Amino acid sequence: MAVVHRLLRRGLSAASPLPSLQELGRRPASSSAAAAGDAAAELRGAREDVKQLLKSTSCHPILVRLGWHDAGTYDKNITEWPKCGGANGSLRFEIELKHAANAGLVNALKLIQPIKDKHAGVTYADLFQLASATAIEEAGGPKIPMIYGRVDVAAPEQCPPEGRLPAAGPPSPAEHLREVFYRMGLSDKEIVALSGAHTLGRSRPERSGWGKPETKYTKNGPGAPGGQSWTSQWLKFDNSYFKDIKERRDEDLLVLPTDAVLFEDSSFKIYAEKYAADQDAFFEDYAEAHAKLSNLGAKFDPPKGISLE
């Protein structure tokens, strides 16, 4: 992604060299010893820097994906932390970044590493979720009721095994989505609501094997051109994902098997139809589901978390 080289925001130098993948993985996890007030102030500073990064690079989709993929490895059937996976910052390590489902996410990590370096007291686990929620909000989406104070895992040996994240084209899409999301403790309503985040971003065939090399909506960027988007305005968070899947009138818009099934499965369809007709209802349910996802598997210090509001 070309935006990796456009780190123009307050306090960061565009001339600063990007760290290597190996260097990123060796960065130490942050200490949680700071007082809650100081921690909140540092988190607010990081949030402002994320906003500037979004303005200068239009990297909203990949930051959303970064937060999701760190949290989405959670297994409710495993009680031991961090073996349960989830939002613990493990995605910063090379071994997990190389999982097939995480193709391209090293670019997201390189984008936000300067923010991590500037705000050393913010954990990777918090920064990933902060960046994801902020990207949703800055793209026009709902305010996510976030809390912070997540503890980082310390070493790559604590990364979850590969295969816990959803695939795009499984043989039985509805069964696959339920297997993955039920394992996290999420419901059919939350599956459909969270799927609506595909209103942002593009699929690149060289990474996922899905989508066209380019379309009329993506051939000129912003950012690196190419890929196929789910919606025509793929940097705007709204309910057009559901409308476009339902109508299927534009061959330049992507519909994966796991997208189409939202209007084919009888339980999923209830929510997909609702969200296509009512953006406010979608925003309300999405904000709740996103916040829940961001907390999966997280260990908080302080135990009740830190609010920025």
From Swiss-Prot:
Pfam families membership: peroxidase
Cofactor(s) for this UniProt protein: heme b
SUPFAM superfamilies named in the record: Heme-dependent peroxidases
Stretch forming the transit peptide: 1-32
Site description Transition state stabilizer, residues in chain: 65
Chain segments carrying region Disordered: 197-229
Catalytic residue list: 69 (proton acceptor)
Extent of Basic and acidic residues compositional bias: 203-217
Annotated InterPro entries: Ccp1-like, Haem_peroxidase, Haem_peroxidase_sf, Peroxidase_I, Peroxidases_heam-ligand_BS
Transmembrane parts of this sequence: none
Binding sites annotated in the UniProt record for K(+): 199, 231, 238
Compartment(s) where it occurs, according to its Swiss-Prot or TrEMBL record: Plastid, Chloroplast stroma; Mitochondrion
Binding locations of heme b: 198
Family according to the record: Belongs to the peroxidase family. Ascorbate peroxidase subfamily.
Additional facts recorded: Binds one cation per subunit; probably K(+), but might also be Ca(2+).
Function statement: Plays a key role in hydrogen peroxide removal.
Protein name: Probable L-ascorbate peroxidase 6, chloroplastic/mitochondrial
Gene source species: Oryza sativa subsp. japonica (Rice)
Phylogenetic placement of the source organism: Eukaryota, Viridiplantae, Streptophyta, Embryophyta, Tracheophyta
